[in-house]
Curated annotation (Swiss-Prot):
Keyword Cell cycle: no
Name recorded for this polypeptide: Dihydroorotase
GO BP of this protein: 'de novo' UMP biosynthetic process; purine nucleobase catabolic process
Pfam families: Amidohydro_1 (PF01979)
Organism: Caldicellulosiruptor bescii (strain ATCC BAA-1888 / DSM 6725 / KCTC 15123 / Z-1320) (Anaerocellum thermophilum)
Pathway connected to this protein: Pyrimidine metabolism; UMP biosynthesis via de novo pathway; (S)-dihydroorotate from bicarbonate: step 3/3
Protein family membership: Belongs to the metallo-dependent hydrolases superfamily. DHOase family. Class I DHOase subfamily.
Catalytic residues in the record: D306
Binding site for Zn(2+) 2: D153, H180, H233
Amino acid sequence: MILIKNAQIVNSIDNKLEKADILIVDDKIEKIGKNIEENPDKMIIIDTSGKYVMPSFTDIHCHLREPGFEYKEDIKSGSRAALAGGFTTICCMPNTNPPVDNRAMIAYIKYRAKEVSPIEVLPVGAITKGLSGEELAEIGFIKEEGAIAISDDGKCVMNANIMRNALLYSKDFSIPVISHCEDTNLSEGGQINLGYVSTITGLRGIPREAESIIVARDILLAKETKAHLHITHVSTKESVRLIKMAKEWGVNVTADTCPHYISLTEEEVLGFNTNAKVNPPLRTQEDIEALIEGLKEGVIDCISTDHAPHHKDEKNVEFNLAASGTIGFETAFSVLFTYLVEKNGFDIGKIVELLNYNPRKIIGLSPNIIKEGEKANLVIVDLKKKWEVKEENIVSKSKNSVFLGKLLTSYVETVIYNGKILKKDGVLSC
């Protein structure tokens, strides 16, 4: 048994704070109430005075690199990094080697996750065979085997007819399509956002229209097919406007953005910082403001990390040779608290909604809720703690965080999943 004393409970649905004790028996929340009797001989007692207890988080977009790229990350190391950040459900993208484009690969991911992961790992299947963009994968079999979505993430499905057919099949099989929106005719060879910083650094720029053109295309295709389109890692103000318009039309479209897009601008690239090379690229302050407004209004539904680990040798090279991507599991909550709550007045309940209720709804899962009879999946956070992101403290196998050296507020101290304490006072037990 676990007894959490003096909890300030935040549930994303009603957005109300409740001060109470929480008794966990086996894998469920047995009781929530005032002054629950302590029994130190039979209980693990955790005093959370001054801290907050909230449902654990879900990430619908990450890269675990297994199979094929285990030198960057693997299912076990990535799951531990996710756990360190408060995530107990993560959805891994199919751009592995070989790609997750058939039922056997879906089965492999599920088997490996069950074998080595302390948390829930859900596979995303490919839209096209080999992520080639040329021939649809066997979407029905992929769904039947347990994929929670389909995506060619890392690549855009450039053929509009292929994308249209994918949406039609996805509707029949009730599976969302996660779209990586990037017109490669515009972005090819680009390194960073096209603008002031690309001009002064001499790095080739990627026009913002590379994203918004495909966002517009896919919205129109979703409107026609009536399929569930999810637009991932939104980074521009134009994309926000297009998604808002689509929702006003009644299109079945959802969207996410990432912590780095709501906090950092293209100026992070100055000095040729390869950890700031991400895809889509970091944009401008105007884009940040539009994304934050989109989150406030519900135009952008949730936050994903797009956790993209790369070996140091793939980052410690000339900028135009460096791999794109940043790790994100371990900093996500703290970045959101620092940049949305502290700097933009968001309610803490809204953050829980962005990391729990909404992402789970998008992939068809019930939310994690702190309620009697529900599974004990929760995190304890210290909202006052300030910490610097340092390479030596990163759990992920790769250390390529765009937030290295940044000072963040709030810290995920303890994580309980299915009634088991997997992280306590900042230390993982798995």
